[in-house]
Every structure is written in structure tokens, then in C-alpha cells.
């Protein structure tokens, strides 16, 4: 089962939380802002459901976060030293956002993008 819930607005775009629940009761909550995992809820040995991620409660918390909590990162993962690299003889200068370095895609990396979501519910296990 997939549940879609309004989460807030970012740059005039609607942001949603998507809750995917499987046949065993496990669920994951994702948002189209940064393709971010908000929570993963799994049963413990006694059947009690627990969130093992500990994500933020509000969209604003993700927007204003210093880190990349639960978000997809990119175009690169980790740091590009001094925000510069060469590829096939072409020099590239990247946005500096971590001391002297470029980190995880810069100022507007994948973590700040609004992702299009395609929901698939043609079996017992939902996916987006």
C-alpha cells in the first residue's frame, strides 16, 4: 500500500511524503524533496514497530539542515578537493560548500531537488 500526504511547499512546489507499507507491516516514509528517507519502521522481536532512522518531523527541518539526513546525495558523493577537477583535458570548477571543497553536489545537489514520483502497486509489495 502507498499513502501520499502533503508535507509542505518548497520554491512554490508541493512536497509530499509517501508511506510504503508491505504485507508484513514494515513501512518506509520518503519524500520527493531530495528523494529523502524520513523513516523506516520495522517490527522488533516482540512485534512492536520502531523507527530506525530518526528523521526530522518537518519539511523546513530538511530544507534548513546542515547535513544530508536521509537524502540522496550527488552529483558526486564525498568531497572534490578545492572544488576543481579535470576530465579529458577539460578543467571544471565546482561550487565550494565545505571549507575549500565541493561536497555531495554543492549548493543545489540531488538532496535539494524535487523528484518526480511514479507509484507502482501491482503486487503485495509497493514501490515508487
Residue ranges of predicted features:
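Surface-exposed acidic/polar loop and edge beta-strand patches at domain peripheries
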Residues: 1-128
Amino acid at each position: 500500500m502507498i499513502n501520499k500526504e502533503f508535507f509542505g511547499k518548497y520554491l512554490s512546489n508541493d512536497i509530499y511524503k509517501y508511506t510504503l507499507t508491505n504485507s508484513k507491516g514494515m513501512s518506509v516514509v520518503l519524500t520527493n524533496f531530495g528523494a529523502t528517507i524520513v523513516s523506516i519502521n520495522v517490527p522488533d522481536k516482540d512485534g512492536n514497530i520502531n523507527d530506525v532512522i530518526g528523521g526530522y518531523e518537518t519539511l523546513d527541518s530538511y530544507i534548513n539542515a546542515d547535513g544530508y539526513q536521509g537524502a540522496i546525495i550527488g552529483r558526486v558523493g564525498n568531497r572534490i578537493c578545492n572544488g576543481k577537477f579535470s576530465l579529458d583535458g577539460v578543467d571544471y570548477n565546482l561550487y565550494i560548500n565545505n571549507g575549500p571543497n565541493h561536497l555531495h553536489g554543492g549548493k543545489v545537489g540531488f538532496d535539494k531537488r524535487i523528484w518526480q514520483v511514479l507509484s507502482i502497486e501491482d503486487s503485495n509489495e509497493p514501490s515508487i
